[in-house]
UniProtKB/Swiss-Prot annotation:
<protein>
    <recommendedName>
        <fullName>Light-harvesting complex-like protein OHP2, chloroplastic</fullName>
    </recommendedName>
</protein>
<feature type="topological domain" description="Stromal">
    <location>
        <begin position="44"/>
        <end position="135"/>
    </location>
</feature>
<keyword id="KW-0793">Thylakoid</keyword>
<feature type="region of interest" description="Disordered">
    <location>
        <begin position="45"/>
        <end position="90"/>
    </location>
</feature>
<dbReference type="GO" id="GO:0009507">
    <property type="term" value="C:chloroplast"/>
</dbReference>
<dbReference type="GO" id="GO:0009535">
    <property type="term" value="C:chloroplast thylakoid membrane"/>
</dbReference>
<keyword id="KW-0472">Membrane</keyword>
<dbReference type="GO" id="GO:0009642">
    <property type="term" value="P:response to light intensity"/>
</dbReference>
<dbReference type="GO" id="GO:0009534">
    <property type="term" value="C:chloroplast thylakoid"/>
</dbReference>
<comment type="subunit">
    <text>Component of a high molecular weight complex containing OHP1, OHP2 and HCF244, and PSII core proteins D1/D2, HCF136 and HCF173. Forms a trimeric complex with OHP1 and HCF244 that mutually stabilizes each subunit.</text>
</comment>
<keyword id="KW-0150">Chloroplast</keyword>
<comment type="function">
    <text>May play a photoprotective role within PSI in response to light stress. Forms a trimeric complex with OHP1 and HCF244 that is required to promote PSII core subunit assembly. The trimeric complex forms a transient PSII reaction center-like complex with PsbA, PsbD, PsbE, PsbF and PsbI subunits in thylakoids for early assembly of PSII as well as PSII repair. The trimeric complex is required for the recruitment of ribosomes to the psbA mRNA during PSII biogenesis and repair.</text>
</comment>
<keyword id="KW-0812">Transmembrane</keyword>
<keyword id="KW-0809">Transit peptide</keyword>
<feature type="topological domain" description="Lumenal">
    <location>
        <begin position="157"/>
        <end position="172"/>
    </location>
</feature>
<keyword id="KW-0934">Plastid</keyword>
<dbReference type="GO" id="GO:0005634">
    <property type="term" value="C:nucleus"/>
</dbReference>
């Protein structure tokens, strides 16, 4: 059971008093505590469906294309990746260090996946195979039940009809 507190104050401002603006503003105050909570509801005078407000267009000047420089005979040597740099007593990780660690982690998990695939029985009761087999069995059972309902012949008769129709057995 919930106890609802009475609304002590609702204040609605008359939108016709401010004719200079195109939007109406209403203020509701539900003060049940010492600290009042004020809600302001604004509505526009436009009609039609609700629309998401659009962002103002950004003004960018088009950049002039930079002519490509002449390629040198040898590419500049890449700097060795830095592990961590201490700046004002704080440890800063570089992008190259993160990239190198990400590649190492990818290789580690690839290797671990290959090792896990190599272990275990090739044939036998594996959970993934058992789930798949169970789903196929339930699907076949559901199809058999629907066929029995539609044709009136039971599951054993359906198997006999299938075997005779495919020419595997002559049961008639």
């Amino acid at each position: 059971m919930s106890v609802a507190s009475p609304i002590q104050c609702i204040r609605i401002l008359n939108p016709s008093s401010s004719s200079s603006s195109s939007t109406a503003s209403s203020s509701f105050r539900f003060s049940t505590t010492t600290k009042p909570c004020v809600f302001i509801i604004r509505c526009s005078q436009t009609e039609g469906p609700l629309r998401r407000p659009s962002a103002p267009p950004t003004l960018r000047e088009p950049q002039k294309p930079v002519p490509p420089s002449q390629p040198s005979s040898s590419p500049p040597p890449s700097p060795p990746p830095q592990k961590a740099v201490a700046v004002d007593g704080k440890s800063v990780t570089t992008v190259e260090f993160q990239r190198q660690k990400a590649k190492e982690l990818q290789e580690y998990f690839k290797q671990k996946k290959l090792e896990a695939a190599g272990q275990g029985p090739f044939f036998g009761f594996q959970p993934k195979n058992e789930i798949s087999n169970g789903r196929w069995a339930m699907f076949g059972f559901a199809v058999g039940m629907l066929t029995e309902y539609a044709t009136g012949s039971d599951l054993v008769d359906q198997v006999k009809i299938l075997l005779s129709n495919f020419g595997i057995l002559d049961l008639e």
